[in-house]
């Protein structure tokens, strides 16, 4: 995979710097990771070369990220993050100068496209690829640099907004408008910029990668949204005056629309079938379609009301709904499996990789059978 190759190249680059800094153990770790991601003769030769050299290390192995540990000793104090986080969960653990630089880059981004590193014409697949790469890189359990948590939230919010067609359209129109930012109390340096995601960054991460990081104890989504919601409520209170009649006149079109919608719903009859038993509407009698043998459930009077062409129409609708459900479930199964495989490769977890490979996709298998039957 191309993403594996890019990640392997990054690991090789880090390993070469470690060799120059006389850190053979660190170099070996990254070279082995690169070889797992994208095997090449060059990496194999470097690993063999390092294994043949005597390693001048003490009895105790050094932690993985030693770069910033040395810097902190030389400076005598820890450097707080840009958002005032110092000495907490992030800065108490080791991190590298590359991680600090990466967090700084995200903080300097002016819009969501720049955060994800994609163009404004990026497709859904481009957004997914960028999010996968960055989410793993900035997750607080992986990246302990100051500000990494905020960067992780920014990446999640960026993807959640841009992957939603309606939100993306609004963002393209108003996202860079200074007055829009000021109206929501955000500057261009703020990660949220007036747009809120419908899902927390941690939930989004779990959706992509089939579960959170092991032993995760970081609550990523702070009360930022609550503050924003409170501000909206406060704005509404400020805008409420003694013009009650004016408000009623403004709401009248919406009330009429709701009323018309409710009446139309009452006039439209419910489907005469369900794909699973629904005693509440009387759909308890099981039937099977003639073409694909799809099970569906109907009421007592179904056989009397639907015969001939009307029955064929109903069964065609049943099969269409069934195929749509299969497609949806198949997509979810593939996403879960792909996310788990990606995590396993990234962390070099052999057990996780084998578990992901064994994960079944029953909906996809059934969908293939149905499609073969339709075209057969």
From Swiss-Prot:
Modifications the protein undergoes after translation, according to the UniProt entry: Methylated at His-186 by METTL9.
Residues modified to Pros-methylhistidine: 186
Modified residues (N-acetylmethionine): 1
UniProt cross-references to SMART domains, sorted A to Z: DnaJ
Gene3D superfamilies on file: DnaJ domain (1.10.287.110)
Renumbered residue ranges of the record's region Disordered: 45-97
InterPro entries in the record: DnaJ_domain, DnaJ_domain_CS, DnaJ_subfamily_B/C, DUF1977_DnaJ-like, J_dom_sf
Entry's Gene Ontology cellular component terms: endoplasmic reticulum; endoplasmic reticulum membrane; nuclear membrane
Topology versus the membrane: Single-pass membrane protein
GO biological process, one term: chaperone cofactor-dependent protein refolding
Transmembrane segments: 243-263
Compartmental location: Endoplasmic reticulum membrane; Nucleus membrane
Low complexity compositional bias, start-end: 57-84
Keyword terms, alphabetized: Acetylation, Chaperone, Endoplasmic reticulum, Membrane, Methylation, Nucleus, Transmembrane, Transmembrane helix
Coiled-coil ranges per UniProt: none
Domain J: 111-175
Assembly behavior: Homodimer and homotetramer. Interacts (via J domain) with HSPA8/Hsc70. Forms a multiprotein complex, at least composed of DNAJB12, DNAJB14, HSPA8/Hsc70 and SGTA; interaction with DNAJB14 and HSPA8/Hsc70 is direct.
Family under the similarity heading: Belongs to the DnaJ family. DNAJB12/DNAJB14 subfamily.
Function: Acts as a co-chaperone with HSPA8/Hsc70; required to promote protein folding and trafficking, prevent aggregation of client proteins, and promote unfolded proteins to endoplasmic reticulum-associated degradation (ERAD) pathway. Acts by determining HSPA8/Hsc70's ATPase and polypeptide-binding activities. Can also act independently of HSPA8/Hsc70: together with DNAJB14, acts as a chaperone that promotes maturation of potassium channels KCND2 and KCNH2 by stabilizing nascent channel subunits and assembling them into tetramers.
Entry-linked PANTHER family: AT29763P-RELATED, DNAJ HOMOLOG SUBFAMILY B MEMBER 12
Protein name as annotated: DnaJ homolog subfamily B member 12
Native source organism of the sequence: Mus musculus
Gene responsible for this protein: Dnajb12
